[in-house]
Amino acid sequence: MQKEEDVCPEAGYCLGTALSSWGLHFMEEHSQSTMLMGIGIGVLLTLAFVGLAAFFVYRKVSRFRRAEPIPQYRFRKRDKVMFYGRKIMRKVTTLPHTLVGNTAAPRQRVRKRTKVLSLAKRILRFKKEYPTLQPKEPPPSLLEADLTEFDVKNSHLPSEVLYMLKNVRVLGHFEKPLFLELCKHMVFVQLQEGEHVFQPGEPDISIYVVQDGRLEVCIQDADGTEVVVKEVLPGDSVHSLLSILDVITGHTAPYKTVSARAAVASTVLWLPAAAFQGVFEKYPETLVRVVQIIMVRLQRVTFLALHNYLGLTTELFNPESQAIPLLSVASVAGRAKRQMSYGPEEQLERSPRLSEFNSSDQRSVAVSGPLLKRSCSVPLPPIHGEIDELRQAQGSGSNTSAFQESQEGATSDLGMAYNRARILPHSEEQLGSSLASKSKKSVVAETSAVFHYSEKPRDEPGPSGRTDAIFRAATKDLLTLMKLDDPSLLDGRVAFLHVPAGTIVSKQGDQDVNILFVVSGMLHVYQQKIDSLEDTCLFLTHPGEMVGQLAVLTGEPLMFTIRANRDCSFLSISKAHFYEIMRKRPDVVLGVAHTVVRRMSSFVRQIDFALDWMEVEAGRAIYRQGDKSDCTYIVLSGRLRSVIRKDDGKKRLAGEYGRGDLVGVVEMLTHQARATTVHAVRDSELAKLPAGALTSIKRRYPQVVTRLIHLLGEKILGSLQQGSGTGHQLGFNTASSKWDLGNPPGNLSTVAAMPVSEDVPLTAFALELQHALSAIGPVLLLTSDNIKQRLGSAALDSIHEYRLSSWLGQQEDIHRIVLYQADSTLTPWTQRCIRQADCILIVGLGDQEPALGELEQMLESTAVRAQKQLILLHKEEGPAPSRTVEWLNMRSWCSGHLHLCCPRRVFSKRSLPKLVEMYTRIFQRPPDRHSDFSRLARILTGNAIALVLGGGGARGCAQVGILRALAECGIPVDIIGGTSIGAFMGALFAEERSYSQIRIRAKQWAEDMTSMVKTILDLTYPITSMFSGTGFNSSISNIFKDRQIEDLWLPYFAITTDITASAMRVHTDGALWRYVRASMSLSGYMPPLCDPKDGHLLMDGGYINNLPADVARSMGAKVVIAIDVGSRDETDLTNYGDALSGWWLLWKRWNPLATKVKVLNMAEIQTRLAYVCCVRQLEMVKNSDYCEYLRPPIDSYRTLDFGKFDEICEVGYQHGPAGFDIWVRSGVLEKMLQDQQGTSKRMDCGVFTCPNSSFTDLAEIVSRIEPAKVAAVDDESDYQTEYEEELPAIPKETYADFQSTGIELDSDSECEPSMSQGPHSLTSPKQSQDSFPWLPNQDDQGPRLYRPS
């Protein structure tokens, strides 16, 4: 029995095992049939359930149909009105209780209702529709050039007249009758292929314009080979303005090395230069204007191209002496020698020195020498006396009578010459009265060792008499050089100066220049090298030669420095006095201009045939994509836009070019077809350098090749540093990339402001902006009233259009930026403002409805190519900006916008005189660099300062402290952006205007992040991420509410990683909280955010660019301050060989006696892989020259240490001042606040012909070309060597400013000479009087002695 009991369990176990194995086997064999059976059962159950549901629904519907119909009652109208009336009254009665809160019941009811609504929203998942910026294509006028070229057929003038007018730049300055008088002399010439137009040896007396066919201009080298420097196509011309000047001055010369021949059968228009002489005989004043234009062309076109861009200096000037024999001085000197032999008591050892004058406190000083037995009392003049009188006679910006007196002259040729030279013509009586009181004194000594003499001769013996005789003799020789036969023209207008060795007579860049005529000694002319601070000697001015006449004729700044390396005496004629002489005798310019031409080298004469000076109308294409690259262009004035056409036919803005930029140089040097189409944004003036001329220059001066290589390399490097790879370059201040705009406008010359409506305080806005711009450089504000005061009431008439354009171009030359204030209606002045503007500011009031104004509708209907920016003004105490999207959506022509918080005075209702009086006081104070107007000024001039905040979790709390330190250090922020936590902190900074509010809101969010309850409630099943993101979304949306990025005070951007397109995204529009949340979406913790625009998935921007300084740079920032708070990876890892065992790692980790190893786990490896691109980008940013990198010591804090907010914030605040102090000591802060254009148009300092572009400046630093040695230096080496040995003991850098010594100073004034009166810093920008025409004249500046440190 026991045995059976033992067997049964075993049998049962065996049976169970067999059944289970059989079941498994059956399931394996019939798995497919089992699945089909299950599906069938499920379908049957579903059909049964649907049938039952249909049955019950049918029963209910049938019962409803069988029920009796209920009668429908109709409300009477009176009952309906009473019903709704009672309902409204019930609402009204409960409203006061809700507002005042007399009882707790209404409040409790409101709270309950709010909770129910929020619960319903969560359950039903209602999504709020945020306003979005509508993507629009740019207007055709922005990216497309006019298809119509120079139209000859539709013009009422003959084609030959149009061709001549279009090509010969000087002819455009003639009035219509004068031009038609010249056209009478034109002759048609038919040429066969190979036939020469002119050859070497023939007289150079003609202007040729090709009507059809093609000419070749050749230059013969020293070895006899001919080089084609220019191909002349129909409509182009062959002429040299220097040759025209030779004909006018009566010094005709033959062609020496230049020839022209017909490449194909051609028809040429021939105009003899002698035709100009007949016109000048009838209209003498026109002579002055034409000579001035030729001189301007020489300085602005020829010297700009050859010196600034090709690095040539001594090669441009003729070192040989051009002096005339000083016969009169020699005869006087001979008599003086005979008189000196009579006795030593009549000898004067040297002229009075500055120390002798400084040692006296009286109005007279005894001038004595060791050999002088008798002393004479010499009255000292006031330093500022007569220069004040001269400036008062010339008129200031506020002198209306001076404007009225000069209205008639301002529109004449002589008046235009005065305007270019920045001299207001005054009447003969004014000049005579100002000089009448000066004729009584004999010898006047000034602190700069300058002697002035009266017209009446002195007969008394002694040193004064002999010096007076030398002065009169030198004046006679000067009359001979200037070809004047009336000595009275120089009476009271010439000063005789003696300067000691080492004196700098005039500095490079001086505006007020004198004509100097050397009598004894020698003046050395130096020019600063473009790649260093060293000077190179251009030529020597010997006795009998002039210097400084080119700057006087053109009104441009002086191109070189004039220095006396040994004692020197010379005559000086101020610019104002020379123009007075010229007003009486216009032909005086011929002799003076001829001295300039003689100083030019033969090389300049050759290149003058190849260089073209052209004017392009707005909308005209300079060249088109795919054209042959046969020349390069230099922008003299105006603005050009480069557009590239993609393969799909779409056009993209590649860049813009302003004054001084090189255009098309890359394609020309690489011999490639044009890569883009370039057209004129507004009427522009260009210099054209043909490729053949460049080839000839390279053969003659090989060092130019090195410079061209650097130009090409720096151009490519500059485009890379602009961040072209980001794909989000912008045009103004926002990376919305609505039109994918190109280079930011750091080189704007003109800005126009126009109102949306008449309610806009445009005058106050313009004055505020002018005040802010004055901190950057000289600025000029022009209004219609201002123009009528300056140029006369008829200045805006069409007949004076060219003269007005010329005058406005001169203002661009001498000012950093010109601000045009348009009228509120479409007047001729408003049209002129739009036509002249590089950028148009459309000014509106932020609290008004975003309706279109009258002027805006006109902008939309006309093809205005200048970029338009929307400026919204807000009151200080008013609400924050809102509804910006509506403003932008209604204005498709706006490429950007800015919000300005204006002081109360902007909106004050004051009359114009009171407004001017108020701003007169305001202009006495420096502008606030933290104001919104200063921010606008920096953005317009390309000096914006950007702040970029990196990602790093809780370590980003240190950025709050750094923001406080920035404000205390006085560093303004114009653009802000960031990644991850940096995007959050940057958004707070862009929205709030006070640090305390930023800290409060940031701390509130940090406390939410430390809430454990909210974190647990946000957990979800980790398929995509550990958290659902609901709680995180609510924490961010509670901070920013419904704020849009467009409504922020500062231009702002956030960086995200688009994992759909595998690219970086830059967000500058849309819901603020949404893109801040997207930028903080860490992989694995938060799900990607779906972009409502295109549905792309957005993740944390730190994976691709954790410190986006390059993006801020592409938005137009000059300097980027980058705050890095990212974690630093461990780099000291264990080298474990070729294989790694996880068991070995486990043993090392658990064994307390084993040596610890540093090996990454899988999560760390994945994290480092994700941040590989970010680390590379960070290294590029840290090594860039535009970025100032700052990293606080926050490595000890972890990513989620939000509970230590105060501690981390304090670390940032303590570290900020330490870093900023280093910036102050090293000069970084000063450089940060300076204008980016080093050669800006300063009235007091610095050279300005045309400022170079940024890449050219870099090339000038890199390229060091050894100058070719010239004969002038070799000739002087015999005596210069021993003289240079004595120079250290001499104040070599003494700079005597003689710019206003051409007028005798009144000896009766009681002002005493004082060193404190004289010096004015040459490096500090001075507010130009023209920049604020209504202010009183404060430009009082007399003779001074300048000693640089």
UniProtKB/Swiss-Prot annotation:
<dbReference type="InterPro" id="IPR056556">
    <property type="entry name" value="NTE1_P-loop_dom"/>
</dbReference>
<feature type="short sequence motif" description="DGA/G">
    <location>
        <begin position="1100"/>
        <end position="1102"/>
    </location>
</feature>
<comment type="function">
    <text>Lysophospholipase which preferentially deacylates unsaturated lysophosphatidylcholine (C18:1), generating glycerophosphocholine. Also can deacylate, to a lesser extent, lysophosphatidylethanolamine (C18:1), lysophosphatidyl-L-serine (C18:1) and lysophosphatidic acid (C16:0).</text>
</comment>
<dbReference type="Pfam" id="PF01734">
    <property type="entry name" value="Patatin"/>
</dbReference>
<feature type="modified residue" description="Phosphothreonine">
    <location>
        <position position="1281"/>
    </location>
</feature>
<dbReference type="GO" id="GO:0034638">
    <property type="term" value="P:phosphatidylcholine catabolic process"/>
</dbReference>
<dbReference type="GO" id="GO:0004622">
    <property type="term" value="F:lysophospholipase activity"/>
</dbReference>
<comment type="similarity">
    <text>Belongs to the NTE family.</text>
</comment>
<feature type="topological domain" description="Cytoplasmic">
    <location>
        <begin position="58"/>
        <end position="1349"/>
    </location>
</feature>
<keyword id="KW-0472">Membrane</keyword>
<dbReference type="InterPro" id="IPR016035">
    <property type="entry name" value="Acyl_Trfase/lysoPLipase"/>
</dbReference>
<dbReference type="InterPro" id="IPR050301">
    <property type="entry name" value="NTE"/>
</dbReference>
<dbReference type="InterPro" id="IPR002641">
    <property type="entry name" value="PNPLA_dom"/>
</dbReference>
<feature type="region of interest" description="Involved in the binding to lipid droplets">
    <location>
        <begin position="678"/>
        <end position="964"/>
    </location>
</feature>
<dbReference type="Pfam" id="PF00027">
    <property type="entry name" value="cNMP_binding"/>
</dbReference>
<dbReference type="GO" id="GO:0005783">
    <property type="term" value="C:endoplasmic reticulum"/>
</dbReference>
<protein>
    <recommendedName>
        <fullName>Patatin-like phospholipase domain-containing protein 7</fullName>
        <ecNumber>3.1.1.-</ecNumber>
        <ecNumber>3.1.1.5</ecNumber>
    </recommendedName>
</protein>
<keyword id="KW-0812">Transmembrane</keyword>
<keyword id="KW-0597">Phosphoprotein</keyword>
<keyword id="KW-1133">Transmembrane helix</keyword>
<keyword id="KW-0442">Lipid degradation</keyword>
<feature type="short sequence motif" description="GXSXG">
    <location>
        <begin position="978"/>
        <end position="982"/>
    </location>
</feature>
<keyword id="KW-0443">Lipid metabolism</keyword>
<feature type="modified residue" description="Phosphoserine">
    <location>
        <position position="1277"/>
    </location>
</feature>
<dbReference type="InterPro" id="IPR000595">
    <property type="entry name" value="cNMP-bd_dom"/>
</dbReference>
<feature type="binding site">
    <location>
        <begin position="610"/>
        <end position="715"/>
    </location>
    <ligand>
        <name>a nucleoside 3',5'-cyclic phosphate 3</name>
    </ligand>
</feature>
<feature type="domain" description="PNPLA">
    <location>
        <begin position="947"/>
        <end position="1113"/>
    </location>
</feature>
<dbReference type="InterPro" id="IPR014710">
    <property type="entry name" value="RmlC-like_jellyroll"/>
</dbReference>
<feature type="modified residue" description="Phosphoserine">
    <location>
        <position position="377"/>
    </location>
</feature>
<feature type="binding site">
    <location>
        <begin position="496"/>
        <end position="599"/>
    </location>
    <ligand>
        <name>a nucleoside 3',5'-cyclic phosphate 2</name>
    </ligand>
</feature>
<feature type="compositionally biased region" description="Polar residues">
    <location>
        <begin position="1314"/>
        <end position="1331"/>
    </location>
</feature>
<feature type="topological domain" description="Lumenal">
    <location>
        <begin position="1"/>
        <end position="36"/>
    </location>
</feature>
<keyword id="KW-0256">Endoplasmic reticulum</keyword>
<feature type="active site" description="Nucleophile">
    <location>
        <position position="980"/>
    </location>
</feature>
<feature type="active site" description="Proton acceptor">
    <location>
        <position position="1100"/>
    </location>
</feature>
<dbReference type="GO" id="GO:0005811">
    <property type="term" value="C:lipid droplet"/>
</dbReference>
<dbReference type="GO" id="GO:0005789">
    <property type="term" value="C:endoplasmic reticulum membrane"/>
</dbReference>
<feature type="region of interest" description="Disordered">
    <location>
        <begin position="1297"/>
        <end position="1349"/>
    </location>
</feature>
<feature type="modified residue" description="Phosphoserine">
    <location>
        <position position="341"/>
    </location>
</feature>
<feature type="transmembrane region" description="Helical">
    <location>
        <begin position="37"/>
        <end position="57"/>
    </location>
</feature>
<feature type="region of interest" description="Disordered">
    <location>
        <begin position="340"/>
        <end position="361"/>
    </location>
</feature>
<dbReference type="Pfam" id="PF24179">
    <property type="entry name" value="NTE_Ploop"/>
</dbReference>
